């Protein structure tokens, strides 16, 4: 069921993976550390409609008006190795709403990373999802 929900929001946007066109992503360790801190502090949402709560461009812009690029980066599990620093295209796989971790955001990250064969990010999202589930029970 979670896979169907995630697919509803992820697949139409991304389309099928084309490995020759994919950017190279690395795991953003600072984002993982922040997500762990938020989970341990119980700053999470267990059931949300990620397609509705995922930050839109206007919300990202508003966040950047009051925060640094480093703060923005901490909400993204992936770093696009081909993009310039301090550009939105540098950061991918957002997992929260700039306040809390969303379980459905982690599921979407894991699903999308698996679909696009970004194994390290897929595993990082999986580990965070397991941590959240363990903490919330």
Regions found by a protein language model. Give the residues of each.
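A charge-rich, low-complexity, intrinsically flexible signal that marks solvent-exposed coils, linkers
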Residues: 20-137
